[in-house]
UniProtKB/Swiss-Prot annotation:
Note on how the cofactor is bound: Binds 3 Zn(2+) ions.
Protein role: Endonuclease IV plays a role in DNA repair. It cleaves phosphodiester bonds at apurinic or apyrimidinic (AP) sites, generating a 3'-hydroxyl group and a 5'-terminal sugar phosphate.
Name the UniProt record assigns to this protein: Probable endonuclease 4
Gene (name only): nfo
Listed PANTHER family: APURINIC-APYRIMIDINIC ENDONUCLEASE, ENDONUCLEASE IV ENDODEOXYRIBONUCLEASE IV
Length: 277
């Protein structure tokens, strides 16, 4: 059975997200720990979390994926921006301990003229500051499309960040299908080769989640424009290949396509229909 979900609004709490997930045929989901623009996180509601955890157990939910706010820039040259990112990451990881054993995903950020090497150094330094040996959450670096001065466009850049981090066992990678295709990794025609390269550079054991997104822009465009599954430049067959690939099929899949909950339900149904049991 595949673990497939989508990004859901956390405005009404965890139990509500779980019930929405069930209503659209999902058995996992992604959520923001706070407003995606980075405002203060909501207070923990232990009863809400307890109700959700019971619902998740009773319905066979897979691993959840929390997503950091988009505004975070851990490798900013502005000390105040970097401090804000560190504060949010620390607070979010404390929150995630109430949902033990799940995943937390973030964008490495933009070096904004400092150079990729400096960006890598700053991201790693920040991870060394916020990760703890006791935490039960795996932090995922997301593969990026390479727009502007983004860090994390190549597998080598992600590996360089990890190499500098002390608690490597607390790290993993979330592969975004739109991003890697836009970054020049041909997962449409050469999926096996891309995964072999990932394994050689990072190790497939680091791959912990997949963002399933088609792309509005062509291959190697270095753009980040998500599209509905099968409606973009990747096409339907690419996603059939991805969800059934022996290396990927047991991972949790998360849709971030430009659809509402009902639309995501349609995509989830289609993906399940094409998943080979």
């Amino acid at each position: 059975m595949p673990y497939i979900g989508c990004h859901l609004s956390s405005a009404k709490g965890y139990e509500a997200m779980g019930r929405v997930a069930l209503s659209i045929g999902a058995n996992t989901f992604q959520f923001f720990t706070r407003n995606p623009r980075g405002s203060k996180a909501k207070a923990i509601d232990e009863q809400d979390i307890a109700r959700f955890l019971e619902l998740a157990r009773n319905n066979g939910f897979g691993t959840l994926l929390a997503h950091a706010p988009y505004t975070l820039n851990p490798c900013s040259a502005d000390p105040s921006v970097a401090r804000f990112a560190a504060q949010v990451l620390k607070e979010d990881l404390e929150l995630m301990e109430h949902l033990p054993g799940n995943l937390y995903n973030f964008h490495p950020g933009c070096h904004v003229g400092q150079g990729v090497e400096k960006g890598i150094e700053l991201v790693a330094d920040q991870l060394n500051d916020v990760l703890s040996p006791e935490q039960k959450t795996i932090v995922l670096l997301e593969t990026m499309s390479g727009k502007g001065s983004e860090v994390g466009r190549t597998f080598e850049e992600l590996a360089a960040i990890m190499e500098r981090v002390d608690l490597k066992d607390k790290l993993g990678v979330c592969l975004d299908t739109c991003h890697v295709y836009s970054a020049g990794y041909d997962i449409v025609n050469r999926l096996d080769s891309v995964l072999e390269h990932f394994d050689a550079v990072l190790g497939l054991e680091r791959l912990r989640a997949i963002h399933l997104n088609d792309s509005m822009t062509p291959f190697s465009s270095f753009k980040d424009r998500h599209e509905t599954i099968g409606k973009g430049s990747l096409g339907e067959q690419a996603f059939i290949n991805i969800i059934n690939h022996p290396v990927l099929r047991e991972l949790p899949f998360f849709l971030e396509t430009p659809r509402d909950d009902a639309g995501h339900g349609e995509e989830i149904t289609w993906l399940k229909e094409h998943y080979r049991n």
